[in-house]
Amino acid sequence: MNLFPIVAGRFKLDGGAMFGVVPKSIWQRTNPADENNLIDLCARCLLIESSDRLILVDTGMGDKQSERFFNYYKPWGGDNLVDSVIGAGFHPNDVTDVLLTHLHFDHCGGCFTWNADRTAFVPVFPNADYWSNESHWQWATQPNPREKASFLKDNLNPIQESGRLRFIEKGKDNPLDLDLLFVDGHTEKQMLPMVDWKGEKLVFMGDLIPVSYTHLTLPTILRV
């Protein structure tokens, strides 16, 4: 098994929204804010290469939303999902499966993009199945007011309409042959892959620990 870190893009969010009750005097030591209190963030994904599958974990924000949307999140840097996959030595057509830790826009937005004349969405990974779990899918498609803005129909509908949406359920075998950790934070039934690699157990933390270093201590971890 081989692992390849993927960067799907970089953007900004309000530091107070990211760290909640943690005082700014603490979090700004590791995540300095700009004049608008925005901190730099990175959409990190993972490619898992096994003997018969190439699994992409999460897809970042994507590029199909409106200019107003992207003005809010202020993308920066030159990184993007497809270039990062190619940089790892693969082509988007090589990806067999896309495992979505959860369905917030910054984790599943890169599954689809516009076609050439911007009249329809097309898959970025045309040979891939999309994996979620039924509990989280229901949570995303019937969202509560708190999370509604994070679950975008332009992301979810194309996945469902593709006919390639698959569900993995807790405690049941799955075709991906991955151990999965199901957590109710920071959204319902987030699904985190665990991989045995070089004698270690690695866990892709998704948004359970969205910011390295700063979100590692118990008081700073997002709601579980």
Predicted regions and their residues:
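Zn-dependent metallo-beta-lactamase
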Residues: 1-56, 61-65, 69-72, 170-171
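Active-site metal-binding loops of divalent metal-dependent hydrolases
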Residues: 9, 59-62, 103, 135-136, ...
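Metal-dependent phosphodiesterase/nuclease catalytic metal-binding core
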Residues: 47, 179-181, 191-213
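Residue-level marker for buried hydrophobic side chains located in beta-strands
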Residues: 55-57, 99, 130, 202-204
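Metallo-beta-lactamase
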Residues: 76-90, 94-106, 121-182
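Metal-dependent catalytic neighborhoods of phosphoester/phosphodiester hydrolases
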Residues: 109-119
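Conserved small/polar residues in nucleotide/adenosyl-binding loops
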Residues: 214-220
